[in-house]
């Protein structure tokens, strides 16, 4: 899980849950969001598919209205008709939301590097900051640099699949995925798990 506030990642956490412990994970994420007055973005495919229903139930039980939104990695890109680069729209460049989101974070990291190292002017909405108090920073860096950029059958940018990563002996980048989600829907203080 990654807790962000604006451009700043303020907490990175990881826990492992077996399939029969998913409800406990939903509660843990919900409690972190409640404590931080934050919203939740969650992976809504595969194991995470049940999270939306769980958060709705927890809202009903608690009387609190925590906002939550599913992240469909294989879904359509955001702003499909906007231009990623001159002459190339998002829908003509990225295979899916996952590839668009990973590229967005890579672009923000490059912008941050240029601002810090080369003292270039920057738009605050286009950079990333990670609190030095965050646990798992080293793991995050490893995971962000693990998947390869790939080209889909349609000739669009995509992120290497987890199955292909597994063939290379690389585990699923769970912390990086949470980090990527946190910067996809991030407009204010937000918790993304």
Task: Kindly give the residue locations of the regions a language model identified.
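Acidic, Mg2+-coordinating catalytic module of metal-dependent nucleases/exonucleases
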Residues: 162-188
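Mg2+-dependent endonuclease catalytic cores in nucleic-acid-processing enzymes, primarily RNase H-like
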Residues: 2-156, 190-191
